[in-house]
């Protein structure tokens, strides 16, 4: 009769503790927003580039699609590390409104009023 095997538990994910200034954290949040805008731009450029037969059409689409998952993960990290910060429209924290309203199902749509 076989003895039941004990399943190995997965290793806990490594964590890191870092110290960031407020400006550093704002820079990370703005980088996420810039990434989102650029990703959306690439997506929006595909059809017009394809319509004129540009060799860049496929590259624009591939980049928009390929980096969408990275953008989603980046946005989730920024949301998590800024969860306790108020989105203040009078400061650089105004970007948090955009980070927190990210909806990947609305592809190519981004609020551009800062």
Predicted regions and their residues:
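Positively charged, phosphate-engaging catalytic surfaces used for nucleic-acid and nucleotide handling
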Residues: 1-114
């Amino acid at each position: 009769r076989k003895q039941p095997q004990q399943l190995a538990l997965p290793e806990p994910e490594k964590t890191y503790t870092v110290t960031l200034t407020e400006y550093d954290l704002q820079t990370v949040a703005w980088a996420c927003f810039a990434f989102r805008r650029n990703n959306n731009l690439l997506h929006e450029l595909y059809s017009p580039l394809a319509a004129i037969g540009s060799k860049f059409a496929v590259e624009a689409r591939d980049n928009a699609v390929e980096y969408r998952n990275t953008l989603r993960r980046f946005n989730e990290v920024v949301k998590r590390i800024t969860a306790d910060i108020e989105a203040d429209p009078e400061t650089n924290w105004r970007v948090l409104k955009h980070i927190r309203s990210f909806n990947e199902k609305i592809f190519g749509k981004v609020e551009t009023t800062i």
